[in-house]
A protein has these predicted regions:
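Chalcogenol-based redox active-site neighborhoods
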Residues: 1-185
């Protein structure tokens, strides 16, 4: 299982290349990216609700395809724990649309396409030399604070165990009140 970085903010935030992603306790940078040619999704749209933010290098690569398919299978558990899932890569919206359709994905894939990698850079999750995002995961609470992050080697599927542990901890800390937390009063 992946270590929980909520207690050890720097435990998994750097890789052998020296890449450094934002750690637990940091404010998650807001963003607004296209999910379709005519629709944008913003982190602010999820205020009051936990978010699993999954940066991945590229649609259609075997590891990314397996990772996103796994998260699609685990999506009901993420939602049971009060979280929504968002995938982000530098691929364009048409590529995402085809990829999501082929994989039957039921969560938004956002295009960090123009300016290329700007959102990934704000999270410390961009690989300049290759022009792709790192394989980086973030669990963000309803107040927009990163509660867990993990940087995986680019060719390794990080799985879902670390995400689930972080969400369970967040869910327990919130006193099991995350469901409906974003509802207007």
């Amino acid at each position: 299982m992946t270590p929980d970085t909520a207690d050890r903010p720097d435990a998994t935030n750097a890789n052998h290349r020296g890449a450094q992603i934002l750690g637990a306790g940091a404010q998650a940078p807001n963003f607004s990216l296209h999910s379709t040619p005519d629709q944008r999704v913003s982190l602010e749209d999820f205020r009051g609700q936990a978010v699993v933010l999954a940066f991945y290098p590229a649609d259609w690569s075997p590891v990314c395809g397996d990772q996103m398919a796994l998260y699609n299978q685990v999506l009901p558990e993420f939602r049971r724990l009060g979280a929504e899932l968002i995938g982000v890569s530098v691929d364009g919206v048409w590529c995402h649309t085809a990829f999501a359709g082929a994989r039957n994905l039921h969560f938004p894939l956002l295009a960090d396409f123009e300016p290329k990698g700007a959102v990934a850079r704000s999270y410390g999750a961009y690989r300049d030399a290759e022009g792709v995002t790192e394989r980086a995961l973030f669990v963000i609470d309803g107040d927009g604070v990163i509660r867990w992050s993990h940087l995986s080697p680019i060719g390794v599927n990080p799985g879902a165990d670390g995400i689930l542990e972080a969400l369970e901890g967040l869910h327990q800390h919130a006193g099991h009140t995350t469901a409906g937390a974003g509802a207007p009063s």
